[in-house]
A protein has these predicted regions:
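Beta-rich nucleic-acid/ligand-interaction surfaces
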Residues: 1-13, 113-123, 220-229
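Short, solvent-exposed helix-helix connector turns and helix-capping sites enriched
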Residues: 114, 142-143, 173
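TRNA-binding/sensing appendages of the translation machinery
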Residues: 1-36, 90, 111
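Residue-level detector of family-conserved "landmark" positions at structurally sensitive sites
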Residues: 1, 110-113, 132, 213-217
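Hydrophobic mid-domain F-helix/FG-region of cytochrome P450s
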Residues: 95-102, 116-126
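Positively charged, Gly/Ser-enriched RNA/tRNA-binding surfaces
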Residues: 3, 25, 33-48, 54-105, ...
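Extended alpha-helical scaffolds
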Residues: 103-120, 131
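Acidic, His- and aromatic-enriched active-site or binding-groove loops in soluble protein domains
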Residues: 12-23, 127-151, 156
Length: 282
């Protein structure tokens, strides 16, 4: 199961380490992410197990870093499969925070985003795909000047244009963000904020100090395309590398001809060990 083959494509997405199999000529890829394999396992070998189920995993992942170097990392994680809704999201997110505290991390930040909100951005009436790609690039790079030029040409009202141009600033505590966007009537944004409110309410019993360590980043792009709702990234104070991430992926199981809601999280153990060795106060 370490090797994943995809005969439908002749190239691999960026960041994945792959090679041609010597005897068959098939394109093979080393595992970059555990979640698709967990979904395949549940849909095949565990399909008769009663839901919801909670699974843990531990093992190596393979990929490429920013300069193209091949890297091997160790990852551990947890998946809550078969349960939809905010309470399940809160259980996983709260578990991540409590686990980091148990590892000795006192100061870290969880940045949460919304994949539904992201899809609303991609569904805007762009002139063509090239413009959509340019918007995505400017949005991911938080390039205000480029965003302004692209958004100004969209056939939408001025208030929504103002909201879109300010995407890079949609970061902060829920109260700060609510104050910043209270004048916007754009429904995708307001709906996303309502979901955040529900998440914090669900976290009250799991993680009473959620306000101290969780911030919103509605201008963030998800690391994985299969996220369908909440997604999050975790960073230790004073350390630039990602130490944990996760999110909801309700549609991933459809690849295996089944329909199961799920949410999960993974810990970047190699990065966590590096933080523990660094002389920084985390």
């Amino acid at each position: 199961d370490t090797f994943l083959a995809d005969t439908r494509k002749d190239e691999l997405p960026a960041g994945i380490f792959g090679f041609l199999e010597q005897f068959t000529g098939r394109l093979l890829a080393l595992r970059q992410d555990f979640t698709p394999q967990i979904a395949r396992l549940v849909a095949s070998r565990l399909k008769f197990v009663q839901l919801p189920m909670r699974l843990l995993y531990l093992g190596p992942t393979f990929g490429q870093d920013g300069d193209g170097s091949r890297i091997e990392e160790h990852q551990g994680g947890a998946e809550l499969i078969g349960e939809a809704g905010i309470k399940a999201d809160a259980e996983v997110l709260g578990t991540v925070c409590l686990a980091l505290k148990a590892m000795g991390f006192e100061r870290f930040k969880v940045y949460i985003g919304d994949a539904v909100f992201v899809k609303s951005l991609l569904a805007l009436p762009f002139q063509d795909n090239a413009t959509r790609h340019a918007f995505c690039s400017a949005w991911r790079q938080r390039n205000l000047e480029a965003l302004d030029v692209i958004v100004e040409k969209l056939p939408i009202d001025q208030q929504t244009k103002g909201t879109l141009v300010n995407l890079p600033f949609l970061v902060g505590s829920r109260d700060a963000l609510k104050g910043r966007v209270s004048s916007s009537s754009w429904r995708p944004l307001q709906k996303s904020l309502q979901g955040v409110e529900g998440l914090f309410e669900a976290l009250e019993d799991v993680l009473p100090e959620a306000e101290k360590c969780i911030e919103l980043d509605l201008g963030a792009a998800p690391k994985h395309a299969y996220y369908t709702g909440l997604f999050f990234e975790v960073y230790a104070e004073g350390f630039p590398q990602l130490i944990a991430l996760g999110g909801r992926y309700d549609q991933l199981f459809s690849v295996f001809e089944t329909n199961v809601p799920a949410v999960g999280a993974g810990f970047k153990l190699s990065a966590i060990m590096k933080v523990r060795r660094e002389p920084v106060n985390f």
